[in-house]
């Protein structure tokens, strides 16, 4: 028998979803069988309702000791060096350097760095968390630098993830240095379609709709010569890089998209430098109208 005590990050989710997250390697058919055969007790009473909504301090007992519980597994990093731009009880915003992956099993990655930092602060304990895992709520490409938001608890994760889906509650802005002087309109809104090929690790952009292409929207505003302010409306993989390449203005040092070489560093001149919170729901409504800015180091040299 395995026992869990429901905490604040487990509550208000169904029994089935909780079990699926907690027993990650257990086949779903087995979890259904547990529920169907009443092999689960909640507060000492057998249940067979997969949609039962868990409440804080509920005691969940699973009568199958052969199925492993998979806790969050990550590479702990001692004395981690994070560039923290903003932090409160619910969220953490860090400045990701170039050439650092968001997530990796084998290499140093931002996820492991953030988790290690929160473990050191005693704000994250994998042995006390049943179904919640600290995670970023949006991503940046490996070669792109800039601001990344992490949710410290379940409710914050839900609110922020949904906010990015609605596209009007959080605004993200980038600085991009193009390989050549900007030769388009000072303000350009681009609506089109994009497809990322995992084999070539490149995205293809099209102004007309094609099969397997997803809609994307980007705004570009000229700042000075080849310095461009970019507002990302949709967040597709390599969206900014592929759109700029389509218009023959590839990002400086972005060899994959035919950008001009600036140096031998594993980086491109693209940085997510500003986040605006607009209309987040409670309990994150205190963030509304807050603007977080972290300019890239190279901006002062242009």
From Swiss-Prot:
CDD domains found in the cross-reference section: PseudoU_synth_RluA_like, S4
Enzyme's top EC category: isomerase
A GO BP annotation: enzyme-directed rRNA pseudouridine synthesis
The UniProt record lists the keyword Ion transport: no
Pfam family, one: PseudoU_synth_2
Disulphides: none
Sorted UniProt keywords: Isomerase, RNA-binding
Entry EC number(s): 5.4.99.-
Domain named S4 RNA-binding: residues: 13-89
InterPro entries, per database record: PsdUridine_synth_cat_dom_sf, PsdUridine_synth_RsuA/RluA, RluA_PseudoU_synthase, S4_RNA-bd, S4_RNA-bd_sf
GO MF, one example: rRNA pseudouridine synthase activity
Active site: 141
Catalysed reactions, as listed in the record: a uridine in RNA = a pseudouridine in RNA
PANTHER family registered for this protein in UniProt: MITOCHONDRIAL RNA PSEUDOURIDINE SYNTHASE, PSEUDOURIDYLATE SYNTHASE RPUSD4, MITOCHONDRIAL
Family: Belongs to the pseudouridine synthase RluA family.
Listed name of the protein: Uncharacterized RNA pseudouridine synthase MCAP_0714
Organism of provenance: Mycoplasma capricolum subsp. capricolum (strain California kid / ATCC 27343 / NCTC 10154)
């Amino acid at each position: 028998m395995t026992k869990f005590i429901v905490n604040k990050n487990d509550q208000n989710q169904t029994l089935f979803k909780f079990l699926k997250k907690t027993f990650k390697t257990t086949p779903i058919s087995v979890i259904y069988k547990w529920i169907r055969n009443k092999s689960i007790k909640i507060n000492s009473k057998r249940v067979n309702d997969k949609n039962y909504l868990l409440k804080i301090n509920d005691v969940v007992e699973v009568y199958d000791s052969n199925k492993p519980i998979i806790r969050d597994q990550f590479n702990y990093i001692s004395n981690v060096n994070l560039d923290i731009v903003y932090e409160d009880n619910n969220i953490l915003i860090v400045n990701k350097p170039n050439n650092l992956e968001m997530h990796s099993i084998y290499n140093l990655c931002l996820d492991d760095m953030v988790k290690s930092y929160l473990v050191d602060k005693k704000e994250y304990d994998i042995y006390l968390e049943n179904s919640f895992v600290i995670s970023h709520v949006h991503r940046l490409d490996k070669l792109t630098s800039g601001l990344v938001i992490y949710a410290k608890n379940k409710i914050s994760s839900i609110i922020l993830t949904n906010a990015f889906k609605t596209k009007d509650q959080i605004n993200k802005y980038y600085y991009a240095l193009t390989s050549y002087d900007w030769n388009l309109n000072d303000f350009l809104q681009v609506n089109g379609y994009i497809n990322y090929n995992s084999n070539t690790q490149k995205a293809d952009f099209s102004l007309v709709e094609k099969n397997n292409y997803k809609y994307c929207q980007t705004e570009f505003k000229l700042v000075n010569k080849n310095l461009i302010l970019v507002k990302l409306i949709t967040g597709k993989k390599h969206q900014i890089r592929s759109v700029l390449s389509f218009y023959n203005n590839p990002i400086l040092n972005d060899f994959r998209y035919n950008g001009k070489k600036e140096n031998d560093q594993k980086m491109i001149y693209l940085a997510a430098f500003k986040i605006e919170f607009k209309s987040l729901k409670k309990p994150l409504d205190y963030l509304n109208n807050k603007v977080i800015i972290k300019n890239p180091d190279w901006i002062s040299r242009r």
